[in-house]
Amino acid sequence: MSFNNQESENLPTFADQKRKTVEVAEFTAEGRYKRKVRSFVLRTGRLSEFQKNAMNQHWGFYGLEHQNQPFDFPAIYGNNNPVVLEIGFGMGHSLVDMALQNPERNYLGIEVHTPGVGACIAYAVEKGVKNLRIICHDATEILRDCIADHSLGGLQLFFPDPWHKAKHHKRRIVQPQFVNTITQKLTTGGFIHMATDWENYAEHMLAVLQQAEGLQNTSATHDYIPRPDFRPLTKFEQRGHRLGHGVWDLYYIKK
């Protein structure tokens, strides 16, 4: 289907509408609804025609919408392979590369920035990746409403917004309630893999994960691991190296 004819030029496309409908919420430590807030800066940005066309033409295959019941992963992917969730995949190149390199896994990416969603879908189409689905919605609501307990094989969180100022640390996505929720969603033996190029956030992640029940740190030194070969080098990591930052990976297994 073409989206370039004159009749459709002035009409809002699916991608245009999606860019304006991302909603997020905040919950208390006990899990009760509190108010709308963001653990990220909502940079919807301007979709390029390339990104817009990718969303308009391929969302039907790659896209999943928020719903009020758990996703049926075997029906969605057509198999019973483990599902790895990545929250905040940016432009999606590393996520697509991991899906391409690991056909025995299914990947589910959540990203609220629509240019990144469009870029990820375009790259997935280019590479012919079929074991990947994308959600453009707040991760908190997806975890609450759409992901059944004990249904995920892993969680990836690479270079989330560190919220540098102390008064903004409460906005960091890695909080005890978040980790507890993820742990509930994991199958036994499932993993949590986080990475950051901000040492203070790495220490925060480590403290939160250490306090969580039912998780085991795979680090021989009980803190961080070297970047594993299976995690692609991201543009954020390259930026960190240029700025002289270290990079800290954390890898935990659900017992």
Curated annotation (Swiss-Prot):
Q: Which SUPFAM superfamilies does this UniProt record tie to the protein?
A: S-adenosyl-L-methionine-dependent methyltransferases
Which UniProt keywords are listed?
Methyltransferase, S-adenosyl-L-methionine, Transferase, tRNA processing
MF (Gene Ontology): tRNA (guanine(46)-N7)-methyltransferase activity
Cellular component GO terms, alphabetical: tRNA methyltransferase complex
Where substrate binds, per the record, is at 165, 197, 234-237
Q: Where does S-adenosyl-L-methionine bind?
A: 86, 111, 138, 161
Q: Name one Pfam family in it.
A: Methyltransf_4
UniProt pathway annotation: tRNA modification; N(7)-methylguanine-tRNA biosynthesis
Which top-rank group of organisms is this from? Bacteria
Stored InterPro entries = SAM-dependent_MTases_sf, tRNA_(Gua-N-7)_MeTrfase_Trmb, tRNA_methyltr_TrmB_bact
EC numbers listed for it are 2.1.1.33
Give the first-level EC class, as a single word. transferase
* Active site per UniProt: 161
Spell out the reaction equation it catalyses: guanosine(46) in tRNA + S-adenosyl-L-methionine = N(7)-methylguanosine(46) in tRNA + S-adenosyl-L-homocysteine
Family named by the database record: Belongs to the class I-like SAM-binding methyltransferase superfamily. TrmB family.
Instruction: List the PANTHER family.
Output: 3-DEOXY-D-MANNO-OCTULOSONIC-ACID TRANSFERASE/TRNA GUANINE-N 7 - -METHYLTRANSFERASE (PTHR23417), PENTACOTRIPEPTIDE-REPEAT REGION OF PRORP DOMAIN-CONTAINING PROTEIN (PTHR23417:SF14)
Which HAMAP family has this protein been placed in?
Answer: tRNA_methyltr_TrmB
Q: What does this protein do?
A: Catalyzes the formation of N(7)-methylguanine at position 46 (m7G46) in tRNA.
Name of the featured protein? tRNA (guanine-N(7)-)-methyltransferase
